[in-house]
């Protein structure tokens, strides 16, 4: 199970830890509590996008086989089988809410607003980590040839150059948000 978790989360964790190091460096944080809050926010943000499977199972399609199985594992607190079930069926779900262009646009706006308005480093690191991992997941879908899954809500799917331009804009927003930190 740990090998599956490591294979699934090694790049998102690397992104989150890199982001935490950058945020600590930019903030020039010297207190242990501040460093801990930034690292904790970044690490928690790594796993946020996977709530999509639970949203799907409990709210969007509770009658599907995937949902019934996941709900059963969740009711019995069988974490090993929850991880296995999500790992083996991660590409079976279409039209995810958190892994989509609309949530990503909202997240881009939220990252700028949260970073510029609050002084609580845990929340700032949390939102920026979600945003950075969202960009990674979008490019992962793009390079696997599943970009239509990311842009499922749009009537006209963007072409290759449109996806790359959109990704570049998101990276610029992320850099701007990190700079505001």
Language-model-detected regions and their locations in the chain:
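N-terminal membrane-targeting hydrophobic helices
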Residues: 1-181
